[in-house]
Amino acid sequence: YEDLETALATVPKFKMAHMNPQAIEFMEREIVLASERYIGKSVFPQELEGVQIGAYLLVTLDGNSEDEVDALIEQAAELVLEAGAIDVLVADTSAKMKDAWAARSSFLEAIMEETKLLDECDVVVPVNKIAEYLTFVNKTGEECGLVIKSFGHAGDGNLHIYQCSNDLEEE
């Protein structure tokens, strides 16, 4: 997605389409870049079709058969493209799935590696309010001289928000 707001606006559409993904994770560009520096591997594209990627959704689908999963993938791809995704990348091998989730799992360590002082806040907000809440948090962080890095479970509104600073003292 070009921006986080567009990515997050997609999430409720999965429920409206009666899809039930196993997981829907959101990731901002900066946290993906930090992860890549930390693990030493590029997993997610930085640019597609000449457009810089600003945010990502990592969607996990499950079904009773390969045909059912393939149909869900097609339905999900159509849904996200209609909602403004730049493109759809399918992790169609176990290696690609492992790489995607390994990158996602490294986010906290990547933040810690690059940040002198950080504090974590886990919150749960309604799925349709995630973008609004993160806009508020980012604006407040900026006003306080903090860099905010966030990622989380967009499917259930469980957000991991990190207030980061390399300039402030702990006191």
Feature map (PLM): residue ranges:
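Noncatalytic alpha-helical scaffold of FAD-dependent oxidoreductases
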Residues: 1-171
